[in-house]
UniProtKB/Swiss-Prot annotation:
Protein name: Malate dehydrogenase
Organism name: Rickettsia peacockii (strain Rustic)
SUPFAM superfamilies: LDH C-terminal domain-like, NAD(P)-binding Rossmann-fold domains
Organism classification: Bacteria, Pseudomonadati, Pseudomonadota, Alphaproteobacteria, Rickettsiales
Gene for this chain: mdh
EC number: 1.1.1.37
Reaction it catalyzes: (S)-malate + NAD(+) = oxaloacetate + NADH + H(+)
Gene Ontology biological-process entries: lactate metabolic process; tricarboxylic acid cycle
Length: 321
């Protein structure tokens, strides 16, 4: 019998539990569900395994508090960290979650140095950078979940605006995973027709699209304000699954993710949301879009925001220099 891929989920909160459920339903691989809180991953694993009997899934799920159980993982998704609460920006979490990420990175380096790693923990662009520097993994094997989620929000709002199926919408969001992200209407389409062309046809207006762009930028904050006790987890989990599946199945999908740039877009040694091709070797290629002067200015502003955040935690990162 062919052995299933081993997928470890670091963090068993709302996103971690949802990830485990989706992986089980899609039968992408056997799961290790890790958390520092005793009983939580074990309880969720048992619940999910019982749910799997109803769905007909034979996926094995192990709950654990021991990092050694992630040994030999093919892929790891990291959600561990403090979640956002009302009034908090993603960036408010930086100090606490940097410490958590350093611990996770050390254990990934020790037990699963060949894994493909997807980081979800906020502030995303900084946390995935910490993971790279502290783990020493190759940059093509460490990415952050950002643009797929941001684009999913943009897709929904555009589908509602144009009254079409979400399956007809394909949007593009670049930059940091924060309030300065750059939703690109020019690279977003409805069944292949660019948004600016649809505006010219009278199907929407520049004003409406700008409102949608602003709502997309605040998409996570809108959910935090409504929930009051936490942040989004269904869409972030679904976004990470799309990235994971492209890696495990060598689908070579082009997805917008936080990728480590080494000169692309004029950016050096930073994680920024850009389109990348994901296959069995990890990041196969960074896709460089031709941006207008206005788009490039917005992108550069977003990059500067990421740089400033990195500066605030560089003393905590041993490999920064």
């Amino acid at each position: 019998m062919k052995q299933n891929p081993k997928i470890s989920l670091i963090g068993s909160g709302n996103i971690g539990g949802t990830l485990a459920h989706l992986i089980s339903l899609r039968e992408l691989g056997d799961i290790v569900l890790f958390d520092v809180t005793e009983g939580v991953p074990q309880g969720k694993a048992l619940d999910l395994m019982q749910a799997g009997t109803i769905a007909g899934s034979d996926i094995k799920i192990k709950g654990t508090n021991d990092y050694k159980d992630i040994e030999g993982s093919d892929a790891i998704i990291i959600t561990a960290g403090l979640p956002r609460k009302p009034g908090m920006s993603r960036d408010d979490l930086i100090s606490i979650n940097t410490g958590i990420m350093k611990t996770v990175a050390a254990n990934v380096k020790k037990y699963a140095p060949d894994a493909f790693v997807i980081v979800i923990t906020n502030p995303l662009d900084v946390m995935v950078y910490v993971m790279l520097k502290e783990s020493g993994l190759p940059h093509n094997k460490v990415i952050g979940m950002a643009g797929v989620l941001d684009s999913s929000r943009f897709n929904l709002f555009l589908a509602e605006e144009f009254k079409v199926s979400v399956s007809n919408v394909n949007s593009m969001v670049l930059g940091g995973h924060g309030d300065a992200m750059v939703p690109l209407a020019r690279y977003s389409t409805i069944s292949g027709v660019p948004i600016p062309d649809l505006i010219k046809m009278g199907l929407s207006s520049n004003e409406n699209i700008e409102k949608i762009i602003d709502r997309t930028r605040n998409g996570g904050g809108e959910i935090v304000a409504l929930l009051k006790t936490g942040s989004a987890y269904y869409a972030p989990a679904a976004s990470a699954i799309e990235m994971l599946e492209s890696y495990l199945k060598d689908k070579r999908q082009i997805l917008t993710c936080a990728a480590h740039l080494q000169g692309e877009y004029g950016v050096h040694d930073l994680y920024v949301g850009v389109p990348i091709m994901i296959g069995k070797e990890g990041v196969l290629k960074v896709i460089e879009l031709q941006l207008t002067a206005e788009e490039k200015a917005l992108f550069d502003k977003s990059v500067e925001g990421v740089k400033k955040l990195i500066e605030t935690i560089k003393e905590m990162i041993k490999s920064y220099y």
